Regions:
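Active-site rim helix/loop that mediates acceptor-substrate recognition in acyltransferases
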Residues: 9-53, 145-169
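Conserved beta-strand in the GNAT
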Residues: 35, 41-51, 57-65, 96, ...
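Conserved acetyl-CoA-binding loop-helix of GNAT-fold acetyltransferases
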Residues: 66, 72-85, 110, 193-206
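Long, hydrophobic, well-ordered secondary-structure blocks that form the structural core
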Residues: 92-118
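Active-site/acyl-donor-binding loops of N-acyltransferases
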Residues: 109-128, 189-193, 199-241
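Amide-forming acyltransferase catalytic core, primarily the GNAT-like/NAT-type
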Residues: 111-189
Length: 241
C-alpha cells in the first residue's frame, strides 16, 4: 500500500525521496488517507491534517493525486466528494486546500471550493542582525497560537512534525518563523511578527537574501469548502507546498 502511494506521489509531485520518507514516517496515517483502486492497484489518493479556526475543526486536504494513465476520469473529484461527506459526518466544519496552479484553482471551484486567503511574497536583503533562538515544535505551536492573525488557522500535531523535518524553527523578540537555508539564501514559508525586522532576521540567518511569505494581500493562496456553514478563515500560512 505505502509503495503504491509513494509511486503516485512521486509521479504527481516529483518530491524528493527524503521528503516522501519524512511524510510517510511522521505525517501519514491510514485514518487520514483515502484511496481509489482500479485494475487491482491504488490509482488515486488524498490525505488530510486536522486544523482549527475559532474552535472549529477543519481538514487541510493534502497530496490529492492520481496516476497519469487514470487522469481525466473524475477519480480525484469523486474521492474529494466522498471524503468531504465523510468529514462532515465526523464533525468537521470545513475543508481547506492549497492549489498549485491557476488551473487547479479553477478545477477546485467546480468542486465547491472558493478562494479564502492570500499571502504576500517578498524578497528581503539582509541588513543588521537580531537574536534568534532555535526552538522545537511544541514551543513553536504555543507561540504561533498567540501570534496568528485574526481568524488564522492553527496547524499542529503531525503537520508540525513534518514541518520540523523540513525547516528550522526560530523565535526572537516579537518574531516567529520557520526557515530553510541554502548557500546564501533563505526561504521563509511563514513569518509572524514585526515585518520591519525582516532584514535583521535575514542577517541573523547568515544569508544575503530571504524569500518570505507574509500574511496580507497578495496572491490567492488557499481555498475553502464549508461543510456546516462555518465562516472561512482569513489566514492560512503553512502549506508544505
Amino acid at each position: 500500500m505505502i509503495t503504491e502511494l509513494r509511486s503516485i506521489w512521486k509521479e504527481a509531485f516529483g518530491d524528493s525521496d527524503v521528503f516522501m520518507e519524512d511524510f510517510f514516517s511522521v505525517a501519514y496515517s491510514k485514518d487520514r488517507c483515502r484511496t481509489l483502486r482500479r485494475d487491482g492497484k491504488t490509482v488515486s489518493a488524498l490525505y488530510w491534517f486536522p486544523v482549527f479556526e475559532g474552535g472549529a475543526k477543519m481538514a487541510y486536504l493534502y497530496g490529492v493525486s492520481t496516476l497519469q494513465e487514470y487522469r481525466g476520469q473524475g477519480l480525484a473529484a469523486y474521492l474529494i466528494e466522498k471524503t468531504c461527506k465523510e468529514l462532515q459526518a465526523k464533525g468537521y466544519s470545513g475543508v481547506l486546500l492549497v492549489p498549485g496552479s491557476e488551473q487547479l484553482f479553477e478545477y477546485y471551484r467546480k468542486l465547491g471550493f472558493f478562494a479564502c486567503t492570500a499571502i504576500a511574497e517578498k524578497c528581503i536583503s539582509a541588513a543588521g542582525c537580531i537574536q534568534l533562538r532555535p526552538i522545537e515544535r511544541e514551543e513553536y505551536a504555543v507561540l504561533r497560537r498567540k501570534m496568528l492573525p485574526y481568524r488564522g488557522v492553527e496547524q499542529e500535531g503531525a503537520f508540525l512534525e513534518l514541518l520540523e523535518r523540513q525547516y528550522k524553527l526560530f523565535a526572537g523578540d516579537g518574531v516567529l518563523l520557520c526557515a530553510a537555508v541554502q548557500d546564501e539564501q533563505a526561504f521563509i514559508p511563514e513569518f509572524l511578527g514585526d515585518k520591519a525586522l525582516l532584514p535583521a532576521v535575514a542577517g541573523a540567518l547568515g544569508v544575503r537574501t530571504a524569500q518570505v511569505r507574509l500574511p496580507g494581500q497578495g496572491r490567492s493562496f488557499s481555498m475553502y469548502r464549508p461543510l456546516d456553514g462555518h465562516r472561512p478563515p482569513l489566514y492560512f500560512g503553512l502549506a508544505m507546498d
